[in-house]
Regions:
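Non-catalytic structural scaffold of enzyme domains
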Residues: 1-226
């Protein structure tokens, strides 16, 4: 199957998806068929902040059409934040959308996980992953920590690099979520790997992007549902 990715939102997340898929195919000794198109991260942040799902879906639509013209069989958005408009995108997309949200729901059910902490954008956290994992009790950052996590995440994703202060925020808040009963903390923002990769944060972590990448890989081999 030919995979189509909408990237650029942010650039580091795109590279993370690409590297993950390359490694998965190499381990399976298979040849990957992949096309990536670029979307603007600042435009996404603007529409996400405004809650304008229709506008962002219309931004993504010509990119999906470009992927279709390139031969892609389905499309995936390489951003948890970008999934805020996934329902609107599915309604207009000429290609099937490899939606991370039902993938996460199946993942948690399969692992028997009932309570998770969330780190990511304000929208992802406040909507509890867009209401897509109702069987899971989501633990959110409290008080000013929610705004701090959102701001640090957006700044990190836009810059495609993490500062020590930003990493300290994510680790401190993550420890608090774990102390408040979260079985694990889900990295609900794709670029959070910049802060967590290769680090000992002191609490269990589930990377939503890694779950999505594995599902995309399995779908492309015909081994998983959309």
């Amino acid at each position: 199957m030919h995979i189509g990715l909408i990237g650029g939102i942010g650039p580091a997340a795109t590279e993370f998806y690409y590297r993950g898929l390359v490694n998965a195919y190499a381990a399976a000794e298979r040849v990957m068929d992949l096309t990536i198109v670029h979307s603007d991260a600042r435009q996404l942040v603007k529409n996400l902040s405004a809650g304008d799902q229709a506008a962002q879906a219309q931004v993504f639509l010509p990119l999906v059409e470009r992927l279709q013209a390139a031969g892609a069989d389905a499309v995936a958005v390489t951003s948890m934040g970008g999934h805020f408009c996934v329902t609107a995108l599915e309604a207009v997309s000429p290609l099937p959308v490899l939606n991370v949200i039902p993938t996460l729901e199946r993942y948690f059910a399969g692992k028997g996980i009932k309570r998770v902490g969330l780190l990511g954008t304000r929208t992802v956290m406040e909507t509890r992953v867009y209401g897509g994992i109702p069987a899971v009790d989501c633990v959110l950052p409290e008080g000013p920590d929610l705004d701090r996590v959102h701001d640090d995440y957006v700044n990190m994703a836009t810059a495609a690099s993490v500062t020590d202060a930003q990493r300290d925020t994510f680790f401190r808040v993550g420890r608090d979520l774990h102390a408040r009963g979260a079985e694990a903390v889900m990295l609900s923002g794709t670029d959070l790997f910049l802060a967590f990769e290769g680090q000992d944060c002191g609490f269990p972590v589930i990377d939503a992007a890694e779950v999505h990448i594995e599902a995309i890989f399995r779908w492309s081999l015909g081994a998983a549902e959309l």
